[in-house]
């Protein structure tokens, strides 16, 4: 059995390197090694929906990993049968003494779910029904880096900050629902996540769920396909706090709006806290049902505007300190003066300054700052002004021409590094130049899954901040797409 556990740990370690943190937790946190007989490893899943999705998305890759690690004859089987789980858990001969003691302790102690999440690879645990119940509502999308303590307060966001902190301390009391609105990169997600983290700290018994509107939509669509809508409704209507990010992504999508309407009513009637974010006021949402818009305005609506000069300087100084770089005050002030868009762009400018210092071993002067700012402004213009004007075929033509690829390369399943990289870039550009969802982008790129597309987008986004070569390539491709 121990060998089986070790093999499963190898699989988890390999997959974790290939997925974003969010993807890994959402698909693998609730999986448990339960048995290894001969060359067959059994892994428990929380429900049939989860089982089907893991098999569909990862079975092929798991087999490839087993072959790579020299375990080609091993088979991994995912199960969710409660009878089989009970049979296994009652057979003490298959359960080590440590596991039996662990299960007995669970009857008298509340398990620390956070510890489980961190130790999922190093300490794969024996499956137990009690443990599954506790973990069911743990939110993998709450990131501990977002706190009220490291949120920089200014006149543009003070009201939103105070309201968010009040909600975390007294959920479901004063401001329910609450909607925070404002442009991209101004700190809406930071506040939303901070609410979740602070509430989790103060109200440990609360079932809190943070989710983006896109993931909410994708999960709803999957639940329809797999006939699991009851599970979906139960998940979202039995929460203590729902944190729904970017509700503007639900425009023109009537089915999910209907579902959100009923979810809203169920939570509101039970005095459960809801917080939403949006890039505009509810009244400005297009193709959104009036009754749902009226629900959003039932509580508190608070905006976050662009940071003023003083706040921009504070943000830049904090980011520079976090990144461990020393930049003259006049350079930081120059960045603050010229980058007036949002917090995300300010932090991106500091990241690029660090890259120049680390990779080129040069001192930063005004010429380098001007170059960096031009890149950021060019990207911002591309991102905000062209989504509806760029033809998908134009994006594809530029990718194929500039990267010297064929249709078969970009839409196939080749694992060659240069082709895989090109597909990541293709997904990233489609996301930035169009309003296509990740599911729609996946269909264009040879039938890739939502998770695969999301991984590609996140990877290029991260690489742009760390790798000057990648960043310059993306800017060059963007410019050629605009001219094409």
Curated annotation (Swiss-Prot):
Its main location: cytoplasm. Keywords: ATP-binding, Cytoplasm, DNA replication, DNA-binding, Lipid-binding, Nucleotide-binding. Residues 73-140 are annotated as: Domain II. Residues 358-484 are annotated as: Domain IV, binds dsDNA. GO terms for cellular component: cytoplasm; plasma membrane. InterPro entries: AAA+_ATPase, Chromosome_initiator_DnaA, Chromosome_initiator_DnaA-like, Chromosome_initiator_DnaA_CS, DnaA_C, DnaA_dom, DnaA_N_dom, DnaA_N_sf. Pfam families: Bac_DnaA (PF00308), Bac_DnaA_C (PF08299), DnaA_N (PF11638). It is found in: Cytoplasm. ATP binds at residues 185, 187-189. The keyword Oxidoreductase does not apply. GO terms for biological process: DNA replication initiation; regulation of DNA replication. PROSITE patterns: DNAA. The keyword Cell membrane does not apply. Residues 1-73 are annotated as: Domain I, interacts with DnaA modulators. Residues 141-357 are annotated as: Domain III, AAA+ region. One of its GO terms (molecular function) is ATP binding. Belongs to the DnaA family. Oligomerizes as a right-handed, spiral filament on DNA at oriC. Domain I is involved in oligomerization and binding regulators, domain II is flexibile and of varying length in different bacteria, domain III forms the AAA+ region, while domain IV binds dsDNA. Plays an essential role in the initiation and regulation of chromosomal replication. ATP-DnaA binds to the origin of replication (oriC) to initiate formation of the DNA replication initiation complex once per cell cycle. Binds the DnaA box (a 9 base pair repeat at the origin) and separates the double-stranded (ds)DNA. Forms a right-handed helical filament on oriC DNA; dsDNA binds to the exterior of the filament while single-stranded (ss)DNA is stabiized in the filament's interior. This is Chromosomal replication initiator protein DnaA. It comes from Borrelia recurrentis (strain A1). The lineage of its organism: Bacteria, Pseudomonadati, Spirochaetota, Spirochaetia, Spirochaetales. The gene is dnaA.
